[in-house]
């Protein structure tokens, strides 16, 4: 029975890391599309849009890093 709970913790950590990566990939894809759409509509605002794009992209990319840290914590510290 002990082995089953450890296996479930490993599966939970894998799901946490995988779903966070998939969500971030979808978010960055949508963000890139909106950036290109905004740049095509108003080319004179490209420097402002680029700055905001990279700030938000960094925030979106930080979520999977946090999830990987939590997943590794669950795998090695809790289990």
UniProtKB/Swiss-Prot annotation:
One of the record's GO molecular function terms: lipid binding
Family: Belongs to the ATPase C chain family.
InterPro entries (alphabetical): ATP_synth_csu_bac/chlpt, ATP_synth_F0_csu, ATP_synth_F0_csu_DDCD_BS, ATP_synth_F0_csu_sf, ATPase_proteolipid_c-like_dom, F/V-ATP_Csub_sf
Annotated site (Reversibly protonated during proton transport): 61
Subunit structure: F-type ATPases have 2 components, F(1) - the catalytic core - and F(0) - the membrane proton channel. F(1) has five subunits: alpha(3), beta(3), gamma(1), delta(1), epsilon(1). F(0) has three main subunits: a(1), b(2) and c(10-14). The alpha and beta chains form an alternating ring which encloses part of the gamma chain. F(1) is attached to F(0) by a central stalk formed by the gamma and epsilon chains, while a peripheral stalk is formed by the delta and b chains.
Record flagged with keyword Magnesium: no
Taxon lineage: Bacteria, Pseudomonadati, Pseudomonadota, Gammaproteobacteria, Enterobacterales
Keywords associated with the record: ATP synthesis, Cell inner membrane, Cell membrane, CF(0), Hydrogen ion transport, Ion transport, Lipid-binding, Membrane, Transmembrane, Transmembrane helix, Transport
Cellular component terms per the entry's GO annotation: plasma membrane; proton-transporting ATP synthase complex; proton-transporting two-sector ATPase complex, proton-transporting domain
Membrane topology: Multi-pass membrane protein
Location(s), subcellular: Cell inner membrane
Protein name: ATP synthase subunit c
Record field: transmembrane: 11-31, 53-73
Function text: F(1)F(0) ATP synthase produces ATP from ADP in the presence of a proton or sodium gradient. F-type ATPases consist of two structural domains, F(1) containing the extramembraneous catalytic core and F(0) containing the membrane proton channel, linked together by a central stalk and a peripheral stalk. During catalysis, ATP synthesis in the catalytic domain of F(1) is coupled via a rotary mechanism of the central stalk subunits to proton translocation. Key component of the F(0) channel; it plays a direct role in translocation across the membrane. A homomeric c-ring of between 10-14 subunits forms the central stalk rotor element with the F(1) delta and epsilon subunits.
């Amino acid at each position: 029975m002990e082995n089953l709970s450890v296996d479930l913790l490993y599966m939970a950590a894998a799901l946490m890391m995988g779903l966070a990566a998939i969500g971030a990939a979808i978010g960055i894809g949508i963000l890139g599309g909106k950036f290109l759409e905004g740049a095509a509509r108003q080319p004179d605002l490209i420097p402002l849009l680029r700055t905001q794009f990279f700030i938000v992209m960094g925030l979106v990319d930080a979520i999977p890093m946090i999830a990987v840290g939590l997943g590794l914590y669950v795998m090695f510290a809790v289990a």
